[in-house]
């Protein structure tokens, strides 16, 4: 219980740090990406997707952001858009995205 409370507190602190980084430097793409990853860890996929969108808007070639946004969309049940993101990630060099697409489409 104490460990869970500590982890929640740490996540809140980290989230505030990312918020501050974004406020100070809104163009810093990795702040959005890392905040999105933290939100995924907290299973807040909707908010994570918003942050991945921001990262991709700032760097349209950010393969990892497409990949992670695709996984977040799949976690929400948005299969078509998740697969589209994974496909884009594959095009940008994350080739294991194709194996996830293959598993999703062979069901």
Please report, for each region that a protein language model flagged, where it lies by residue:
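Alpha-helical tetratricopeptide repeat
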Residues: 1-107
């Amino acid at each position: 219980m104490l460990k869970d409370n500590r982890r929640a507190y740490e996540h809140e602190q980290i989230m505030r740090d990312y918020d501050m980084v974004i406020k100070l430097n809104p163009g810093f793409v990795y702040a959005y990406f890392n905040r999105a990853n933290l939100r995924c860890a907290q299973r807040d996929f909707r908010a994570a997707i918003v942050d991945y969108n921001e990262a991709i808007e700032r760097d349209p070639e950010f393969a990892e952001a497409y990949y992670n946004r695709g996984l977040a969309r799949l976690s929400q049940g948005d299969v078509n858009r998740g697969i589209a993101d994974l496909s884009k990630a594959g095009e940008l060099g994350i080739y294991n995205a194709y194996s996830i697409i293959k598993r999703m489409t062979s069901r």
